[in-house]
């Protein structure tokens, strides 16, 4: 793993109304969007950024999001396409803990876990309008206990093996891999900048901007905790991309996702 490689793990898709994707702008109607995780193979280890959604959880709690997910799009299945198992991942980083970004955390009791220091407390005690976003609590025994949802925990999940290192601000995760603080969508949201020896950097907006249109128009999703911070974060992402000459990749943009490399293909 001397050269940095980035794999996008296809996690299936979900549906939202257009007015939720593009807050107060639309147009309305069903918008099917991708969900994916980011695997970084690096000289310092294997880093997994986000873990997608759990199909059974969505069908139980948010069936109106109409999940489509095949076996190879689960976290174990997607890793299996690369000849890997969950135990091969060294570090799991969660950009935030909305259900479509943490559904596979339960497969990594052994891994070091990192998130913004405000995210676990927020999942324990979300705002009334955040309860569905923070509805899959299988990532944290602490959060599940706080919300009376311990039935969600995979057998063997404990506080000891589901504890996170809390960070704040922009943080170097590894050489050439940087977490970019972009609050607004959630209280402690992170975007991701990855640099490579032989190609331009990639800046993953994650949910700071669902789509290319979102970033170009500074139109955030309807799911947020601080819309002013969200707009400022989008401006920060745009400037970082310009300053670094980075390629932008979006979290929930189906048109762009169709052009991304997935499966065994990689960036590096």
Swiss-Prot record:
Keyword field contains Cell inner membrane: no
Record pathway: Cofactor degradation; B6 vitamer degradation; 4-pyridoxate from pyridoxal: step 2/2
Entry binding sites for Zn(2+) 1: 96, 98, 185, 207
The name this protein goes by in its record: 4-pyridoxolactonase
Species: Mesorhizobium japonicum (strain LMG 29417 / CECT 9101 / MAFF 303099) (Mesorhizobium loti (strain MAFF 303099))
EC number of this enzyme: 3.1.1.27
Oligomer status and interactors: Homodimer.
InterPro entries attached to this UniProt entry: MBL_superfamily_lactonases, Metallo-B-lactamas, RibonucZ/Hydroxyglut_hydro
């Amino acid at each position: 793993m001397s050269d940095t490689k980035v794999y996008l793990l296809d996690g299936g898709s979900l549906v939202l109304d257009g007015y939720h994707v593009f807050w107060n702008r639309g147009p309305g109607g069903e918008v099917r969007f991708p969900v994916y995780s980011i695997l970084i193979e690096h000289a310092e280890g294997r880093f997994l950024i986000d873990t997608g959604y759990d199909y059974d959880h969505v069908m139980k709690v948010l069936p109106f999001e109409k999940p489509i997910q095949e076996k190879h799009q689960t976290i174990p299945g997607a890793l299996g396409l690369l000849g890997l198992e969950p135990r091969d991942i060294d570090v799991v980083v969660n950009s935030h803990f909305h259900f479509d970004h943490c559904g596979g955390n339960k497969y990594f009791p052994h891994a070091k876990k990192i998130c913004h220091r405000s995210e676990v407390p927020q999942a324990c005690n979300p705002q009334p309008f955040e309860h569905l976003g923070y509805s899959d609590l299988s990532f944290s025994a602490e959060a599940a206990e706080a919300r009376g949802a311990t039935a969600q925990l995979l057998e063997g999940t404990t506080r000891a093996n589901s504890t996170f290192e809390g960070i704040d601000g922009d943080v170097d995760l590894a050489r050439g891999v940087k977490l970019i603080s972009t609050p607004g969508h959630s209280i402690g949201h992170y975007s991701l900048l990855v640099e490579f020896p032989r190609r331009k950097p990639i800046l993953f907006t994650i949910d700071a901007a669902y789509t290319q249109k979102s970033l170009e128009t500074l139109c955030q999703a309807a799911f947020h905790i601080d819309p002013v911070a969200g707009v400022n974060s989008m401006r920060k992402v745009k400037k970082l991309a310009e300053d670094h000459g980075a390629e932008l990749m979006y979290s929930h943009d189906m048109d762009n996702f169709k052009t991304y490399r997935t499966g065994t293909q990689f960036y590096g």
